[in-house]
């Protein structure tokens, strides 16, 4: 036994782990197998990490909040300067604007991820990004107010609200505020911030400065652009290209971009009092006694006039705590020459010493300075498109104020989804096209008798189960849980651009919609008492009818839950450019790939499942069901592992797990595979990477085994119906 006896230390996993931390780090499955499928993103933000309990209703709590009292407390905080982190110019407003901006500004329109909707600035990596230096202090300054109001206001809402109050206390009229951002309690795992492994790395570019999708920042750890210019090159014209690219990826046009930069830089200053070598580790790397505060500086006092944040030392205007048009007055009022901050960062000053003594010091009333600008500020003057807009704003300050108010509201609410999700007394009445408006219900809804009648009409229409299910799926599955856009409500599948997307098979879609519109017209004409059915409802109902019939074909009578209340959006309520970003490049649920991508198809499936807020079991049962319902793009038979298509059986799993089948790639690309009889070599099935991953990946195989078991058919049908219903209702915020 002597050679096998374990010492106490070896047996004690805690002690062993502690020793391990001193010599190295524990190896995760992903360290061993870098291509390991990242299924954990389907299970983030579960109840196990949430301290609030299953009965907690944030919307209800927020509605009970005295918002005016919160704003009064925030207004008092703005000028309550603390010795441990004194306010520039005696006002914390500019710091809080930066906090709110950097909370919301991580949003990118490409996949809807990022943004301020979940309070992620509290967690890694955002809490430790180089662009967020010293925002930890802003949140600590807010803690007494958060502590006072507790569960009634989330950190996510409080950070955005504080940015609004900051502006209002400095004389700016904001456009409004909508609450409803519910906090999460762990870092997001689904957001791809880039492949770089060093701060400020920029391996995200290829070719002629082509930025990788869906990224919306030029370097790892920045919110947008490098203020010194591309890679620190102080070229305002080149910087303008970066600005235009990343702001567009945040869904901002040129006018909104100029308004945001100029409006934001009406306030406050940047901080570059000394070399960055004086700055200590970021919050996530700081010592335990720092209690989550980072970037402790050894330069002078480390605060006040000695603060080092981004390295630039720029104060844009002579009125840094008062709303004005002085940013443009100063930008156009001087000729500029390149200089460096005390930290060594490139910035600009007026030529010939002009403007000396016109800018106040942030902490010493006896000191005065010259104006200064960043390279990216000068982009607004020297890029010809930006210059025209900037000149217009300079000459029309009222237009700047309105454009900035609207752009700021869009910046801080873009990831919240439809206006129906906004809470509180300051929600603006105006409906904005980027909110993807849908008309309010203006008619009596169909009842159970009507639903049964319409199902019968649909099933007798000549449309196949595959057509009914596919159409409902492509309508509903545009939903993104990230920014709450897309979904079946609005029936935008019949409008540009969605009606022409390849994934929707436009010719077949038009046939299905024409048939359903005929049924809709017939019903609405015959109905009395103002009762109507919207096409949005009818599309979903048709899919539900198809699923019910498929279950019946498999020997099971089920009723798929259906709740009417969707409405049909108009083309003029649909921003074509914005909606184009929702076009799927892949839909593994229908075995669709628009092109070959660097990421394998199975990763794209998981990504879409995450955007649909699906769990791994829900993803699994939906793929298995969609295959046997014959819903593949182009009617391919890849993954249709059944002899009874359009019957809701568990055949996909039974046949995938059949050890009598051997799988072989048909080409070196390894995207299509043939399943051959091990004995005869006869080809039985064909499948894609998405199909085979449910037998290859150990976690997904475990789930497939559940649904492929002899006693699993009824469970499979029930679970498919539940997951299907979830997808159909993802955008039904009116039901919450």
Swiss-Prot record:
Region feature Disordered, mapped onto this chain: 1-30, 351-373
Keywords, alphabetical: Heme, Hydrogen peroxide, Iron, Metal-binding, Oxidoreductase, Peroxidase
Polar residues composition bias: residue spans: 12-21
Ligand binding (heme b): 265
PROSITE patterns given in the database record: PEROXIDASE_1 (PS00435), PEROXIDASE_2 (PS00436), PEROXIDASE_4 (PS50873)
Cofactor annotation comment: Binds 1 heme b (iron(II)-protoporphyrin IX) group per dimer.
InterPro entries: Catalase_peroxidase, Haem_peroxidase, Haem_peroxidase_sf, Peroxidases_AS, Peroxidases_heam-ligand_BS
Site (Transition state stabilizer): 98
Protein family membership: Belongs to the peroxidase family. Peroxidase/catalase subfamily.
Quaternary state and interactors: Homodimer or homotetramer.
HAMAP family: Catal_peroxid
Name listed for the protein in its UniProt record: Catalase-peroxidase
Lineage: Archaea, Methanobacteriati, Methanobacteriota, Stenosarchaea group, Methanomicrobia
Gene from which the chain derives: katG
